[in-house]
Amino acid sequence: MYMMTALQRGVWASLLWPYLITISIPLDCKEEQGSLSRCPSISQEKLLDRVIQHAELIYRVSEESCSLFEEMFVPFSLQLQRNQAGYACITKAFPIPSSKSEIQQISDKWLLHSVLMLVQSWIGPLAYLQNTMDHYDGAPDMLLNKTKWVSEKLISLEQGVVVLIKKMLDEGILTTTYSEQGLFQYEVQPDMLESVMKDYNLLSCFKKDAHKMEILLKLLKCRQTDIYNCP
């Protein structure tokens, strides 16, 4: 039953994957020379809509990837072990509000910079995750493709958020004291089980942060249209 569930999920994902790719509208922020020049030609409202769509898709695919990885490589007993062990997420130290009341109180400026902080903190770890999963025995192509897709779309999302900050705030990027190297270590795990659990924790934490990105961006959108009735 356990393997059948994973197989069925893989079949459905294979059928829906081309559709998901089709409906994803590119941000088109980067030209061949590497300069950000296409996004500035898009209206602020349309750019925000595209950024939100990217965040929605990234969260949806990260959720599917986490579930598929869980079913293929992490027995239920190990899922409980992760919860009991209290694995920490790499963004735990970030000064980003988590409760609804706290989020409602932060400014538009900090909303945008919080999203950018989350996006940039995950680019390296997702590249690492993509590399390690290539060495898994029996890892389905669907899982590998989803991980690669999310990694690429995250870079696109970063470009869109950077331009959005310039459009909405008319300023550059805030500098932070957090560095990706200080938050995430790329050491090789000597034990396969330990490596699997670390990768599972990364996927679970990214799914959580991807959802937070989506929530923050949708709150920003709400404030632009109906500031007095935002959830």
Curated annotation (Swiss-Prot):
Q: In which tissues is it expressed?
A: Pituitary gland.
Taxonomically, the superkingdom here is Eukaryota
| KW Nucleotide-binding (keyword) present | no
In its keyword annotation, does this UniProt entry include Disulfide bond? yes
The SS bond pairs are C29-C39, C89-C205, C222-C230
Q: Where in the cell is it found?
A: Secreted
GO biological processes: animal organ development; growth hormone receptor signaling pathway; positive regulation of growth; positive regulation of receptor signaling pathway via JAK-STAT; response to nutrient levels
Residues carrying sugar: N145
Q: Name one GO cellular component term.
A: extracellular space
Q: Which residues form the signal peptide?
A: 1-24
- InterPro entries xrefs: 4_helix_cytokine-like_core (IPR009079), Somatotropin/Prolactin (IPR001400), Somatotropin_CS (IPR018116)
What name appears for this protein in its UniProt entry? Somatolactin
